[in-house]
Amino acid sequence: DKNQNTRITLILRNTYNGVHSNQISFPGGKKDKSDSNLKHTAIRETVEELGIDETLINLVGPLSQVYIPPSNFNVQPFVGIYNGTPFFNPDSKEVSLLIKPLLKDLLNIKSIKSEVFVQNKKIIVPSYIIEGHVVWGATAMIINEFITLFNDIINS
């Protein structure tokens, strides 16, 4: 927007017995049989997890698919714009916290290396620190692609 108040919405997943427990991610999940395509899945999952109005979401398009080895999933991210200021009512069963950095801040963020634990093993991964949270893995890759594409558009 003209006031540069556009935000990206990430979630901190709740703690549960699974490989993505307590991790930062974009809203999303598995394709249901009722989903006509992956675009529908992306919108449905976003609405379910964030509790926002589906009619105000405008999908811009897909980013590159990302494979996630620990869960053996191919993730198809989509970029969407919410037309208006969202009123969030996050699903407390899935979402512990909403993280909403300003787009203008995200565009200037630099990748760092962080230590994280995956299945009780310490690994060093490329990551971002966003509002005090370590963002790594598929989420960091999606953010990196988004930043690169957005900056290419702005600078062309």
Where do the language-model regions lie?
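Unchanged
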Residues: Y16, K31-I130, V135, T148-S156
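Basic, gly/Ser/Thr/Pro-rich low-complexity segments located predominantly at protein N termini
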Residues: Q23, P27, K33-S34, V66, ...
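N-terminal strand-loop-strand
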Residues: D1-F26
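A broad "ordered helical/assembly scaffold" signature
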Residues: D1, E54, Y67, A140-M141
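Buried hydrophobic packing segments
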Residues: T139-I147
